[in-house]
Swiss-Prot record:
It comes from Lachnoclostridium phytofermentans (strain ATCC 700394 / DSM 18823 / ISDg). Reversibly phosphorolyzes beta-D-galactopyranosyl-(1->3)-N-acetyl-D-glucosamine to form alpha-D-galactopyranose 1-phosphate and acetyl-D-glucosamine. Active towards galacto-N-biose and lacto-N-biose. Does not phosphorolyze galacto-N-tetraose or lacto-N-tetraose. In the reverse reaction has activity toward N-acetyl-D-glucosamine and N-acetyl-D-galactosamine, but not L-rhamnose, D-glucose or D-galactose. One of its GO terms (molecular function) is 1,3-beta-galactosyl-N-acetylhexosamine phosphorylase activity. It comes from the Bacteria. This is 1,3-beta-galactosyl-N-acetylhexosamine phosphorylase Cphy0577. It catalyses: beta-D-galactosyl-(1->3)-N-acetyl-D-glucosamine + phosphate = alpha-D-galactose 1-phosphate + N-acetyl-D-glucosamine. Gene3D superfamilies: 3.40.50.880, Glycosidases, Golgi alpha-mannosidase II, Immunoglobulins. Keywords: Carbohydrate metabolism, Glycosyltransferase, Transferase. Belongs to the glycoside hydrolase 112 family. Its EC number is 2.4.1.211. InterPro entries: Class_I_gatase-like (IPR029062), Glyco_hydro_b (IPR013780), Ig-like_fold (IPR013783), Lact_bio_phlase-like_N (IPR035080), Lacto-N-biose_phosphorylase (IPR012711), LBP_C (IPR035356), LBP_M (IPR035363). Disulfide bonds: none annotated.
């Protein structure tokens, strides 16, 4: 197994009892140095002595139904809100589990409902007195008396997760029949906590051949709800609503000194998703969860190290409260983090995590029947996944790559096996070339929103790397940034409020999203400390880029709160009485010089108009889509949307350079063809040119001193040079 490091290593493959010869073959062909099991597979006896690291997935919260059934009061719980129901008379009956899979949840009839449930008159936002409602266990309904006719009502209640949502998802997707539904137990609860430490020790002792415990995960499932037809009903990869129990909430109350309300989690039915501006109470709850999750996870990691094993965390599933970009995470003491790679943004979600010895990306496709079936094209999916993620790897590499699922399925596609072999070799080469150095960054860019670093690289991501029509025009900005030569940070309005001097270490700020959301700020713009800090930043020479409805919030005669900086305002109807005369777009501009066609703004924005003195780059039917403006010594750029594409990445790149007054540095580690990118590693005396497309490309390459040469590249090709 031992090979030259350029020829082997840094790759993890899955296995199962019926693919031992195939596993051994791929250890050599792919140069793998680690083997893992997966949900629904078993580790073969024959491979326990293999000369490779062995990962074993360890489920901290499931795969022990005997314990869960013996302690039903310590099964993990979730806050759920019913649909809105309109009272047509003074009595109203609201069914709690209507629209939810009965296999997934069971109403918590154990704890004090008066204390932990909440009925709200949504027409008045008033909490309904507990004296006027009751729960009918037989029908599963809450009965409200003394209703106000034609008011809307909801019930917020606790339910037990009687089928682990991830296990349910895997069972539905793979068509598993007759499998026992795994119940999610709550490791935070006292009996289960004590038992879990004994259970972990027993597992490690019974698996002496295992080198790495791959924790899945610590300890609360992201919000994932299915309807009666087993379809996804609600999903939030960052959702906290399944991290609750009366036991946890009583601890929270003691720490913060005020009474908990279900509405802190329910949030009118929006569940504090990342588009909602977080309340003080929810931020307090997140901080509490981070501390408690880290404290308990550290106990497990310490046990792992006591046995001489490595502790790896899977980034996903039951990971709520770990928050890898926050300070508490590094106190856990993990050796590694592994996560699924769906694109460049999700690659950076993993590779940028501080405080671990190494990171690993699990690449797509997962070896499941939804891709590996007759007529399926796993090679195409693998190519798209690798080439998309490679941009981000070249900026901040993960340390390892891997695959998961049923190896038997993958082996039925020889072309796929061949392609992944080439990916493994290419990854090892680029890792050797760039390890230990920071690539050349032309400017420092900060994405500004309400979440800051807590949602670094996950901004505008509802479900892991999945497309949403309403936000792809914004998520594309984050994806573009994941592979561009900038030092990227994520800052919050709270960060600026705490110390506006942080802006002195930033060249360009990006504010991207719809108005009155957490991404653009909403109510925060009524705080003069925030608005004046950004005004001053730009006035003194900083760059500001706004996409969508940046700083959008109706207040004091403005919707776009930095309208005088952007030179752009939105017509909401309030300014129809004012005539607008600035509609002429310039024929050319530095930002659009590389565009080969009309700029793709995605969904764009309606009713945006330019103020006097603003330079319009693109307007369509008297609606501004792109414009630039000068404010003091600084510059701003406005775009109505910017979905991810190579051409749009170039538009963003030029926008950043222009707003930072860096036009003269365009031809520095630069490709004239936007389908091709250049990454320089000055410390390692290397640079590479990479073709991001699936066809050959011609380009002119500019080195760091602006000298140039012409180049032809094959499809997907990457070429390395000495500086």
């Amino acid at each position: 197994m031992k090979k030259d490091t350029m020829l082997a290593g840094r790759v993890t493959i899955p296995t199962d009892v019926d693919v031992v010869p195939e596993t051994m073959e791929l250890l050599n062909r792919w140069g793998a140095d680690a083997i893992r099991d997966c949900d629904g597979t078993d580790y073969p006896e024959e491979l326990k002595a293999v000369q490779a690291k062995v990962y074993s997935t360890y489920y901290t919260t499931r795969k022990d139904n005997a314990w869960a059934k013996a302690h039903p009061e310590e099964v993990q719980q979730c806050y759920i809100m019913t649909s809105f129901y309109t009272a047509t008379e003074t009595t109203l009956r609201i069914p709690l589990l209507k629209g939810i899979a009965k296999e997934l949840m069971m109403v918590n009839n154990y704890d004090d409902k008066v204390r932990w449930w909440e009925v709200i008159d949504r027409s008045t936002a008033m909490v309904v007195s507990t004296d006027t409602w009751s729960y009918d266990k037989e029908t599963g309904e809450v009965i409200i008396t003394n209703c106000e006719p034609f008011h809307n009502y909801t019930v917020s209640f606790l339910a037990y997760l009687i089928w682990d949502p991830v296990h349910m998802y895997n069972a539905v997707v793979n068509g598993w029949q007759g499998v026992e539904h795994q119940i999610t137990f709550d490791v935070r609860q006292p009996k289960t906590r004590e038992y879990s430490m004994v259970r972990l020790r027993k597992f490690i002792e019974e698996h002496p051949y295992v080198d790495v415990i791959r924790y899945t995960t610590f300890f609360h499932q992201f919000t994932l709800v299915f309807d009666e037809m087993m379809r996804e009903k609600y999903v939030d990869w960052y959702g906290y609503s399944a991290s609750v129990s009366p036991y946890i909430l009583e601890q929270f109350e003691k720490e913060v000194g005020y009474r908990f309300r279900p509405e802190f989690i329910i949030d009118q039915g929006y569940y504090n998703n990342q588009y909602r501006i977080p309340s003080k109470e929810f931020k307090d709850f997140q901080a509490f969860q981070r501390r408690e999750v880290a404290k308990l996870a550290k106990e497990m990691v310490d046990i792992t190290h006591e046995y001489g094993k490595e502790a790896m965390m899977f980034l996903g599933d039951h990971w709520i409260g770990t928050e890898p970009f926050m300070e508490e995470f590094k106190t856990i003491g993990l050796d590694a983090v592994v996560g699924s790679v769906g694109n460049g943004s999700t690659l950076r979600l993993i590779s940028d995590i501080p405080g671990v010895k190494y990171t690993e990306g699990r690449f797509l496709p997962y070896f499941f029947p939804d891709t590996f079936h007759e007529g399926g094209d796993p090679v195409k999916e693998a190519k798209v996944n690798w080439v998309t993620a490679r941009r981000a790897i070249l900026r901040k590499p993960i340390d390892r790559i891997g695959y998961g699922g049923y190896l038997k399925l993958a082996c039925q596609f020889p072309e796929f096996i061949d392609y992944v072999e080439s990916v493994c070799n290419e990854f090892r080469e680029l890792y050797e070339n760039i390890k230990g150095t920071t690539p050349f960054c032309i400017k420092r860019v900060a994405v500004l929103n309400s979440w800051g670093k807590m949602r670094a690289w996950g901004a505008h991501m509802v479900h892991h790397a999945l497309y949403q029509k309403q936000n792809y025009s914004y998520a594309g900005v984050i994806e573009s940034l994941s592979g561009t030569p900038f030092e990227v940070s994520f800052i919050s309005f709270d960060d600026i409020k705490k110390d506006k001097n942080i802006l002195k270490n930033i060249d360009v700020i990006i504010n991207v999203g719809d108005g009155d959301t957490a991404h653009t700020g909403g109510l925060v713009w009524e705080d003069a400390d925030i608005s004046s800090a950004i005004h001053q930043f730009v006035y003194e020479g900083g760059g500001l880029i706004g996409i969508g409805e940046p700083t959008g919030h109706q207040y004091q005669g403005r919707y776009i709160q930095l309208a005088n900086v952007f030179g752009i305002e939105k017509e909401t109807g309030f300014t129809l009485n004012y005539d607008k005369y600035n509609w002429d777009a310039v024929e050319s501009h530095f930002i659009t010089e590389d565009c080969t066609k009309e700029v793709d703004f995605g969904e764009g924005k309606k009713n945006m108009y330019a103020l006097e003195g603003t330079t319009i780059l693109v307007q369509m039917e008297k609606e501004v889509q792109m414009a630039v403006n000068e404010f003091g010594k600084g510059r701003s750029v406005y775009l109505s949307g910017l979905p991810y594409s190579f051409e749009n990445s170039r538009v963003l790149y030029r926008s950043i350079l222009w707003s930072a007054h860096e036009e003269e540095n365009l031809h520095k580690w630069y490709s004239s063809n936007f389908n091709v990118e250049v990454h320089a590693y000055v410390k390692n005396n290397k640079y590479c040119v990479v073709n991001n497309t699936y066809e050959p490309q011609n380009t002119t390459i500019y080195r760091g001193d602006s000298s140039s040469f012409d180049l032809e590249l094959e499809a997907n090709e990457i070429i390395w040079y000495e500086i």
